[in-house]
Regions:
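Single conserved hydrophobic/aromatic residue that forms the stacking wall/gate
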Residues: 1-10
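N-terminal Rossmann-like NAD(P) cofactor-binding module of classical short-chain dehydrogenase/reductase
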Residues: 12-15
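Short beta->alpha linker loops
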Residues: 17-18, 101-105
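Glycine-rich phosphate-binding loop and adjacent beta-alpha segment
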Residues: 21-93, 125-127
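A structural signal for short, well-ordered beta-strand elements
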Residues: 47, 99-102
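An acidic, carboxylate-rich microenvironment
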Residues: 53, 105-108
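C-terminal capping/lid region of NAD(P)-dependent oxidoreductase domains
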Residues: 85, 90-99, 107-127
C-alpha cells in the first residue's frame, strides 16, 4: 500500500501537550497498538484517564518529560536537538508564530503566555 513501517508508527501516535478535557477523547480515538504521548498540560487541568482504555486498545500511555530525559540521556538528547535544528533549516518543520512583541513590550508578551492567549510561539523582537 506504499507506506513504510515508520509512517505507520506515526499514524498510531497521539502527541498531547494540552491535557485537560480532550485527552480522554483523543485516547479513545487511538488506533490499535497506538502510543499516547503525554507532553504537558497547557490547558491547566491534568486529565484523568480510564486505564481500561489502554487494555482495550492495546495502547501505551507514555509520559515524556524533556528535562529528566535530556539529563539522563544527554547524547540522545543532543542528537534529537541536532535533528530538529536540521529540520528547521531544511524548512521541514516551521514553528507557528502567532504573536510578535517589541522587546520593550516584554511584559505584554509574558502576559499573553500567562493568560493562555498564545496559540503558537511568542517572539520578542529586538528590531
Amino acid at each position: 500500500h506504499g507506506s513504510s513501517a515508520a509512517s505507520d508508527v506515526y499514524k498510531r501516535q497521539i502527541y498531547d501537550p494540552v491535557g485537560g478535557d480532550f485527552s480522554e477523547q483523543a485516547f479513545r480515538a487511538i488506533a490499535w497498538n497506538g502510543r499516547f504521548l503525554v507532553i504537558g498540560f497547557a490547558s491547566g487541568p491534568i486529565a484523568k484517564m480510564p486505564l481500561n482504555l489502554a487494555l482495550l486498545k492495546g495502547a501505551s500511555l507514555v509520559g515524556v518529560f524533556w528535562g529528566s530525559w535530556s539529563a539522563r540521556e544527554p547524547n540522545e538528547s543532543q542528537n534529537n536537538f541536532s535533528e530538529l535544528i536540521k529540520m528547521v533549516d531544511d524548512k521541514k518543520f516551521i514553528p507557528l508564530v502567532t504573536e510578535i512583541f517589541k522587546l520593550e513590550d516584554h511584559a505584554s508578551a509574558f502576559a499573553c503566555i500567562e493568560e493562555r492567549r498564545a496559540k503558537g510561539k511568542v517572539i520578542l523582537s529586538m528590531k
